[in-house]
Amino acid sequence: MSRYRGPRFKKIRRLGALPGLTSKRPKAGSDLRNQSRSVKKSQYRIRLEEKQKLRFHYGLTEHQLLKYVRIAGKAKGSTGQVLLQLLEMRLDNILFRLGMALTIPQARQLVNHGHILVNGRIVDIPSYRCKPRDIITVKDEQNSRTLVQNLLDSSAPEELPNHLTLHTFQYEGLVNQIIDRKCVGLKINELLVVEYYSRQT
């Protein structure tokens, strides 16, 4: 199954805010309407919607998300928390959380087009897994820096999560540590996602 490229507002109206997909938010009152409908939802649908939230927020295909779930299941610790850490430490998401892109798809384009370096080397793989002490920089070329500067200027000022540091004037971000669960930028019940996949096998 490919990445979703359809109307974004349609998704947030059904699933709630998906900041990685779009900066738009559901209209006031839509949460109440969704809650009134949720009384009739089956447990399967609740798990499915949590899975879809995760998939659309991070811009993954079904195959990619399943792969991450399997990796998380083999790791030590809570499968759900490890899953979120894996997704949050992707390079495209790190750029998004640093404010260098307004959405994760936009961050993915920056990476694909060779605008981003990790530890001094161009990385053009959006799924690259960042590690503590990684230094993310924008390529030292005018078009790359102008592009990112415009995005930084356009992004709404938000407090950075504690696992990241941004040096705006150097066009540089630093990964301080693996992200804490409380700093994940999406309202999600990751256990329901894990449960969804465990029931599919």
UniProtKB/Swiss-Prot annotation:
Recorded GO CC terms: chloroplast; chloroplast stroma; plastid; small ribosomal subunit
GO molecular function: mRNA binding; rRNA binding; structural constituent of ribosome
Record has Zinc-finger as a keyword: no
Compartments where located: Plastid, Chloroplast
Stored Pfam families: Ribosomal_S4, S4
Family note: Belongs to the universal ribosomal protein uS4 family.
HAMAP family noted in UniProt: Ribosomal_uS4_B
Keyword Kinase: no
Species the sequence originates in: Arabidopsis thaliana (Mouse-ear cress)
Protein name (record): Small ribosomal subunit protein uS4c
Signal peptide (from-to): none
Disulfide bonds, paired cysteine numbers: none
Stretches assigned to coiled coil: none
Biological classification of the source: Eukaryota, Viridiplantae, Streptophyta, Embryophyta, Tracheophyta
Entry-linked InterPro entries: Ribosomal_uS4 (IPR022801), Ribosomal_uS4_bac-type (IPR005709), Ribosomal_uS4_CS (IPR018079), Ribosomal_uS4_N (IPR001912), S4_RNA-bd (IPR002942), S4_RNA-bd_sf (IPR036986)
Purpose of the protein: One of the primary rRNA binding proteins, it binds directly to 16S rRNA where it nucleates assembly of the body of the 30S subunit.
The S4 RNA-binding domain, residue ranges: 89-152
Domain of life per record: Eukaryota
